[in-house]
């Protein structure tokens, strides 16, 4: 069984709904986002709400991911937005590099409570620390190094968390560690500035679905607006996007 590939029928909608994320809201996420979630990746930052034991409603912003338990069922992990990153276990130099968005290598505890070396990086959206064992990223780095014929000095540059720009024919390519990526490495066309822009995904302002629309909140996350609550601006944008789709569908392919 593939522990990381989850079918839509297995999604624990009941758990998500208890945190204010209805089946319709989840289904209205962009298709590429849904596919990523079903592959075990983390969601965008979304608003949730839950009632505590005293009946108070608590509102928060969080990412979530789907995980398969040992018994084969699927559960939900939440990654709430923190006020600030917890960096106590890192040196002052490592803290500075982490706050600059770079990856650092430092010990982490494995499942058997043994220290193991790992790459660490701050998720700028939630301020959570992302950690991946060094052998996993190291293997992927070696594949990239072979593909781009990187020197030992260039590989070392990547290992210490610095993006590397190389010439590939007539193009510039920039490579760097980004633990938000499935492979832990982001490769893009362009220089370091373009790499940073690529690493920080910007959502379209309006992401329309069947029942409502996910709207970019300006802070790297999304908020949901039901169709009944669309503003005039949203209706106009929906009309324009529908017209664009019709024009694209009617454009003859070369």
Model-flagged regions — what are they?
Residues 15, 19-23, 121-254:
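A eukaryote-biased signal for long
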